[in-house]
Amino acid sequence: MKNLKLFSEVPQNIQLHSTEEVVQFAAYDIDQSRLFFASSANFVYALQLSSFQNESAGAKSAMPVEVCSIDIEPGDFITAFDYLAEKESLLIGTSHGLLLVHNVESDVTELVGNIEGGVKCISPNPTGDLLGLITGLGQLLVMTYDWALMYEKALGEVPEGGYVRETNDLSVNCGGISISWRGDGKYFATMGEVYESGCMSKKIKIWESDSGALQSSSETKEFTQGILEWMPSGAKIAAVYKRKSDDSSPSIAFFERNGLERSSFRIGEPEDATESCENLKWNSASDLLAGVVSCKTYDAIRVWFFSNNHWYLKQEIRYPREAGVTVMWDPTKPLQLICWTLSGQVSVRHFMWVTAVMEDSTAFVIDNSKILVTPLSLSLMPPPMYLFSLSFSSAVRDIAYYSRNSKNCLAVFLSDGNLSFVEFPAPNTWEDLEGKDFSVEISDCKTALGSFVHLLWLDVHSLLCVSAYGSSHNKCLSSGGYDTELHGSYLQEVEVVCHEDHVPDQVTCSGFKASITFQTLLESPVLALAWNPSKRDSAFVEFEGGKVLGYASRSEIMETRSSDDSVCFPSTCPWVRVAQVDASGVHKPLICGLDDMGRLSINGKNLCNNCSSFSFYSELANEVVTHLIILTKQDFLFIVDTKDVLNGDVALGNVFFVIDGRRRDEENMSYVNIWERGAKVIGVLNGDEAAVILQTMRGNLECIYPRKLVLSSITNALAQQRFKDAFNLVRRHRIDFNVIVDLYGWQAFLQSAVAFVEQVNNLNHVTEFVCAMKNEDVTETLYKKFSFSKKGDEVFRVKDSCSNKVSSVLQAIRKALEEHIPESPSRELCILTTLARSDPPAIEESLLRIKSVREMELLNSSDDIRKKSCPSAEEALKHLLWLLDSEAVFEAALGLYDLNLAAIVALNSQRDPKEFLPYLQELEKMPESLMHFKIDIKLQRFDSALRNIVSAGVGYFPDCMNLIKKNPQLFPLGLLLITDPEKKLVVLEAWADHLIDEKRFEDAATTYLCCCKLEKASKAYRECGDWSGVLRVGALMKLGKDEILKLAYELCEEVNALGKPAEAAKIALEYCSDISGGISLLINAREWEEALRVAFLHTADDRISVVKSSALECASGLVSEFKESIEKVGKYLTRYLAVRQRRLLLAAKLKSEERSVVDLDDDTASEASSNLSGMSAYTLGTRRGSAASVSSSNATSRARDLRRQRKSGKIRAGSAGEEMALVDHLKGMRMTDGGKRELKSLLICLVTLGEMESAQKLQQTAENFQVSQVAAVELAHDTVSSESVDEEVYCFERYAQKTRSTARDSDAFSWMLKVFISP
């Protein structure tokens, strides 16, 4: 669905030597982009194609040409002409048989051969190694570029005595013979005469180029003009012939390499027998076929296009018959057509493909004098199918469509120079026009309109167009008869007036009048016109080079500014469209341009470098574009938010729009992978349709619904509270229904639940919605890769926790159903669904509703209205069973203690009666409390079971106790329900026994005390090591003095064995009166001050001496340990600094070699291992394993883990984690808080005993150790984050001095006695 548009036309004139001289042949130099023309006067003219681009718009002047004369005999003339790129020379054949090579640069002509009968056709092989030549005698010669003849063949098949063309019959225009090569040069086709049935006919022959073998030939036909054109891709050979016994116009037929005809089409209307085809040319892309058709009063250049097994006439350009126009395609540019006339007027026309689908998704496909109209919003109907058609008086060249403000108009420029207009009815009535054909009259115009190149509606009564005047083909335009002296290109406004009243629901095809109201000469070519939707009666005009200017109706062109910067595309963009976007509440134009290299620019800035097509999508009805649709050459369809483009959030350049196949899952889901290679975006369906229309290379249409557009449409519908539209979108595109709730938060949805239910107005759909609810935010999970543009009030922007989403939403839906929807069976089933799908399911409430319906049925109520408004109980129950697990429903029915209901549930769930009837019958025979108890036990409702069994009576107390013992959480409730004091004591004792089993001895002891089980309480206290509790219970048990003393000795030993010598000392002193034993225990507990106090209390010298000797011994041992620890601190710090220095050097080396540190094996490291000591009782030794002890292997067996734990006290020298392990060990050597307290107690004890020297020595040694450890840790911490280790900066002595001077007053050194602190 595309049309071929002429977007640039540059005519120029060759200044010939005489008026009688005419241009006859042309050749193209691909390397230097030159055209060579040979005239009837044997002159050769050379033109540079770049001169066409440098000329001003529509300038008609003599071109600068290079002229050379071919020196041949009088009476001889040029009959064949071509350019040999390999020799950089022109190859010329004459009527007398001369074969000349003319070097263009040196202007030297060389005779290379003389052909008998004259040269009729010359055709070089596309691969540049062979040359085909046809003589005037009908002989085929194939030679090399060295002029060596490879073979000679006869083209015709004329028997003896048949007619043979004389050599003097050779002329320029005799035609009849040609050579056409396949694109790869392996085969070529010729057309030769055949004498058959007494008359001369022609047939196509296909030859193999290397051997000259005849591969195949066609049937004999009445081929005209000897036209033969092999498609460059090699698929088809085009030829022209007239059908036998048929007076209609000739047909263009297509043949395969095997000589069989594949298809054909007529070049004109069937009734027009005066038309004939003079020339055929394929473009380099093999998709366009251009031909010169000679009509009764004019010659026409026609361009055909093939799609969906149909040939479309896409362009027709008329010339006067006397002009003798000829065409050729630019070999390097598939859409550039070069035309020249006999008088030397050369025109270069640039075509472009434009989508036939307009902004409102209506397709207008041009086919000759018809326009095929299809509204794609009604049906995806690929051409040549259509809804209805419009017929015109001549071929259609260009169209412009207007669809705004309830007006739908079409302006059509015809090949005869006339304008036609059509006004359509409202689009919703177009279905009634199906199959109709409307004949459109030309408009009345009294002025010369010229040849339109661009056409655009400004408003419903005004057209803006670019028109060319002065070209030779203007003489064939109907408006060319009006006197005008205009030359060049003009920008002009055309006023359109309709003198007939438009009839609603009808197509208006006549009564229009056009007149030029404004006209201004253009100094440079206009390449595109685009309507400005943000400003009334205005447009944007693009000039050559990409400069974009603004135009207001009936005014001069004024420079357009966007953010105070001129809009100028980086390159010329033939495809220009303007989108109206919303920029913070202000509508602004977004000017998009696409050049022929695939560069897409927005407001002059490059957005994408590999774009193949683009379009706009609007989710609103106010023509504000919300998304930009980009299809790349990689066949990825991107959906870009226009707000991101305005804010600059979209990455510029083609990097953003190229997807790495290995990372596609990680990319933002804003693109769609198009499965058809080479497909193009031809249009979109705006609004809630949210569709992108693609046309594949095969011609069929595909409509896709990108998820991002669909979600955007849903968001927009929800923002406008259009719940039904949003629901239908979700349902149609299989979007998760939770989107409706999650987009703006489920709490916001609760406020709109009534509107949702009323708008959807379909209980089956509401049920479907309810069943889809789940406790998660799908915008953060399933659709987290899509960005949602939230609209509406701020209340809708609340995002909530999903913990109770389902229950809250379904409750709101249920309330809306009950209050705003009339009673009906469907409503009741929907309500049951909301209960069943709640989280957790409200099964009991659902069963109660069903139970009430069943009771109503059993009562045989006469309220028929009530019966009709509810489903039957069986239907409701089956619906509930369909939603939920039948076992859960059966258990819930049992939980209601309704055995009849449970039986009905079991029957409807298709359970075997043998499974449930005996059980239900057994329950029915039980007392009510016992039945409830049995049911509660089955359902594991133990609290209710306990209440029921207690209410069953005293006789069931053993069952009560069994239940409580099996479910210990019931003990508190049991104590509350059981009022008998004796039975309460039984419950308490059982509870305490349970606590003993749980190893909760202290709680068990307390519980035993509550039930007066003192002996068990004493054992419980003893188990938990609470000697005070044991002795308290012993007093309650009224034990004797000896028994208490014995118990105290036993407890003293047990407590000491548990590692609590201080508490054992307390028992020995207070209960056993063992002074010596108590002091020894205090010494073991390192409670030096308390031991000395007890010794002084009992004034025993021997005991004081024991304390003194123990204190001195401990002080001596600590001094030795602290000195050893100081040495280890120095050792670890030295090793750390060495390792750190080596690591830094290696890292620098690896960085220079661009290698990773992880891959390096430190071969220079030592293999020795350093073991940690236990250090002293006053230091904290870390037992964490270093990273160095962890193997780099991925295998992690349990045995290896255990082996690592055993080796966790070691540091492997040279391992990757040695640095941090050394730092961790230095930190682990710090003094603990308990050690500091015990050290201070020892110092005070020594001072009290008069051992000041020992105390001072101990304090100084301990201080030195602590200063060393703190300084070493600080030094290591500073070097970890440093990139170098400077020995002067990171000096241990400096850190130690700093620590000693600043840290003495800190809490860490509060254990020190001030009297011993050195200055």
Swiss-Prot record:
One of its GO terms (biological process) is positive regulation of cell population proliferation. Pathway: tRNA modification; 5-methoxycarbonylmethyl-2-thiouridine-tRNA biosynthesis. It is found in: Cytoplasm; Nucleus. Disruption phenotype: Narrow leaves and reduced root growth that results from a decreased cell division rate and a reduced apical dominance. Increased abscisic acid (ABA) sensitivity and drought tolerance. Higher resistance to oxidative stress mediated by methyl viologen (MV) that blocks electron transport during photosynthesis and by CsCl in light. Accumulates anthocyanins. Residues 1188-1197 have a biased composition (Low complexity). Expressed in meristematic tissues of in roots, stems, leaves, seedlings, cotyledons, guard cells, floral buds, flowers, siliques, and shoot apices. Residues 884-1319 are annotated as: Mediates dimerization. Keywords: Abscisic acid signaling pathway, Auxin signaling pathway, Cytoplasm, Nucleus, Repeat, tRNA processing, WD repeat. SUPFAM superfamilies: Tricorn protease domain 2 (SSF69322). Residues 1201-1210 have a biased composition (Basic residues). Residues 1188-1215 are annotated as: Disordered. InterPro entries: A-sol_ELP1, Elp1, ELP1_b-prop_2, ELP1_N_b-prop_1, HB_ELP1, TPR_ELP1, WD40/YVTN_repeat-like_dom_sf. GO terms for cellular component: cytoplasm; elongator holoenzyme complex; nucleus. WD repeats lie at residues 73-112, 171-217, 272-314, 316-339, 521-561, 640-685, 1265-1302. The keyword tRNA processing applies. Belongs to the ELP1/IKA1 family. Component of the elongator complex which is required for multiple tRNA modifications, including mcm5U (5-methoxycarbonylmethyl uridine), mcm5s2U (5-methoxycarbonylmethyl-2-thiouridine), and ncm5U (5-carbamoylmethyl uridine). The elongator complex catalyzes the formation of carboxymethyluridine in the wobble base at position 34 in tRNAs. Promotes organ development by modulating cell division rate. Required for auxin distribution or signaling. Prevents abscisic acid (ABA) signaling leading to stomatal closure and seedling growth inhibition. Involved in oxidative stress signaling. Homodimer. Component of the elongator complex which consists of ELP1/ELO2, ELP2, ELP3/ELO3, ELP4/ELO1, ELP5, and ELP6. This is Elongator complex protein 1. It comes from Arabidopsis thaliana. The gene is ELP1.
